């Protein structure tokens, strides 16, 4: 019976994965799932995720159990993997935690790794991409060292684009609030550059497909983007349409936005630094997902469909 350790199950994409596991329980009788969660004394930002966990535990046909561990503590992870004898790690929690958990998993014989990282690694700007590149370089080096010792390790890296679908996502949720509150809407260069944000439901379902089609998906890298490229301006317009508001867009030249960011940086003696954020505003972030579509039928929803649920959540929050 394959034993799969999953982190980040209470996050929004993790919740959709868990819902899929419950829905597919008849096909998962040969699996055991260990859901690695933060200790109960640490306040969670995802109460809905923990409620879903409680509901899942009632499902007797699905072989799951919950284990507590602090993903920032290598000693706790070492003790966990020493006791669980896992076959696969599906790490959703955070790319920044990968270097904590992957070495401990490998040390204790976990030979199949699915790591959910980010397309942010492709950014040319240092703060956005350099940390991710360093983490992955160390992981690849460690895996190579184990392979030299004869281990048959299979590692697949998933790279979502900008994720939306939750009011705590810090991305599209910010745009929703801005569109709702600002009738005069400032943009940089008219916001005419391509993004390809991905709905967290599509991610959760993709995680399931990668895990259950492992003979096909092992030792691959997949970009998990949204249905199609969409300009940021079109994102604003779609949000406004679903909110029922109208905005007047004012375009600020890129050079002026950069100048303003520099002024703020100097005036605050470096305490407030928007320089790189302004640069990333005009960095194209649209990526195709052809490999995922070919290997496991990945077919994400268009933005106009995926954003509906988040818009309704926002409306409910305002009431």
Regions found by a protein language model. Give the residues of each.
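SDR active-site strand-loop-helix element
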Residues: 7, 36, 92, 113-119, ...
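A conserved pocket-lining segment of Rossmann-fold NAD(P)-dependent short-chain dehydrogenase/reductase
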Residues: 177-198, 209-210, 216-218, 223
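Conserved Rossmann-fold NAD(P)-dependent oxidoreductase catalytic core, especially the SDR/UDP-sugar
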Residues: 88, 99-156
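Flexible, glycine-rich beta-alpha linker
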Residues: 156-174, 193
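Mid/C-terminal beta-alpha module of Rossmann-like enzyme folds, strongest
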Residues: 210-273, 289, 295-319
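Glycine-rich phosphate-binding loop and adjoining beta1-alpha1-beta2 segment
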Residues: 40-58
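Conserved Rossmann-fold cofactor-binding substructure of NAD(P)-dependent oxidoreductases
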Residues: 65-86
């Amino acid at each position: 019976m394959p034993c799969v350790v999953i982190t980040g199950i209470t996050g929004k994409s993790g919740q959709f994965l868990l819902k899929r596991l419950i829905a597919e329980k008849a096909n998962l009788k040969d699996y055991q799932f260990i859901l690695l969660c933060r200790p109960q004394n640490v306040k969670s930002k995802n109460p809905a995720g923990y409620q879903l966990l409680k509901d899942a535990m009632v499902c007797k046909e699905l072989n799951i159990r919950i284990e507590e561990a602090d993903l920032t503590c290598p000693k706790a992870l070492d003790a966990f993997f020493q006791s669980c004898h896992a076959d696969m790690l599906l790490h959703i929690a955070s790319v920044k935690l990968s270097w904590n958990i992957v070495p401990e998993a490998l040390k204790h014989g976990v030979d199949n790794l699915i790591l959910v990282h980010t397309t942010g690694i492709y950014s040319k700007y240092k703060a956005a991409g350099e940390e991710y590149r360093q983490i992955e370089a160390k992981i690849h080096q460690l895996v190579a060292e184990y392979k030299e010792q004869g281990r048959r390790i299979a590692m697949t890296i998933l790279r979502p684009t900008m994720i939306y679908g939750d009011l705590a996502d810090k991305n599209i949720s910010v745009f929703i609030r801005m569109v709702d509150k600002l009738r005069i809407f400032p943009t940089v260069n008219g916001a005419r550059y391509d993004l390809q944000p991905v709905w967290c439901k599509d991610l959760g379902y993709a995680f399931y497909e990668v895990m259950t089609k492992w003979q096909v998906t092992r030792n691959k890298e997949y970009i998990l983007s949204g249905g199609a490229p969409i300009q940021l301006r079109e994102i604003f317009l779609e949000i406004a349409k679903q909110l029922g508001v109208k905005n007047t867009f004012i375009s600020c030249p890129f050079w002026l936005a950069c100048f303003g960011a520099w002024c703020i940086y100097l005036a605050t003696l470096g305490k407030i630094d928007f320089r790189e954020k302004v640069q990333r505003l005009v960095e194209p972030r649209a990526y195709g997902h052809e490999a995922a579509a070919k290997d496991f039928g990945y077919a994400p929803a268009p933005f106009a469909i995926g954003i509906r649920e988040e818009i309704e959540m926002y409306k409910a929050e305002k009431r």
